[in-house]
Amino acid sequence: MAKKIVGFIKLQVPAGKANPSPPIGPALGQRGLNIMEFCKAFNAKTQGMELGLPIPVVITAFADKSFTFIMKTPPATVLIKKASGVQKGSAKPHTDKVGTLTRAQAEEIAKTKQPDLTAADLDAAVRTIAGSARSMGITVEGG
């Protein structure tokens, strides 16, 4: 018989930097889950990734105080800012442009994000990433 699910916890945790301090500690503590067990498992899974890159994670809490977690790909905005060398997006995205993103960079981000996007193919995923970049005030070259 399957375990009874008590709830889901959605967090964004920096890769390799999970520790019991907020927001992780209180979120897991409310459900009675072992905080250090999650931190060790998460840090081990994110070992090969860039340190500090925010990783969305969905933790499934079970009635017997056990848990499983699924890691998603980093947010598109973070990847776009990193690729274009921008600290933050524009306050007026359609009038003030803050950076540029090439088609090749957009394709690279789309390949990274492909598992989490609903796009049918790579070209549709690139258009999704390009749209996100434009809404941040970043010009997309060649697309």
Curated annotation (Swiss-Prot):
Q: Which UniProt keywords apply?
A: Methylation, Ribonucleoprotein, Ribosomal protein, RNA-binding, rRNA-binding
Q: Which GO terms describe its cellular component?
A: cytosolic large ribosomal subunit
- Cite the GO molecular-function annotations of the record: large ribosomal subunit rRNA binding; structural constituent of ribosome
Q: Which PROSITE patterns match?
A: RIBOSOMAL_L11
A Gene Ontology biological process term: translation
The protein's PTM annotation reads: One or more lysine residues are methylated.
Q: Which family does it belong to?
A: Belongs to the universal ribosomal protein uL11 family.
Role noted for this protein: Forms part of the ribosomal stalk which helps the ribosome interact with GTP-bound translation factors.
> Subunit structure of this entry?
Part of the ribosomal stalk of the 50S ribosomal subunit. Interacts with L10 and the large rRNA to form the base of the stalk. L10 forms an elongated spine to which L12 dimers bind in a sequential fashion forming a multimeric L10(L12)X complex.
Q: What is this protein identified as?
A: Large ribosomal subunit protein uL11
- Native source organism of the sequence: Bordetella pertussis (strain Tohama I / ATCC BAA-589 / NCTC 13251)
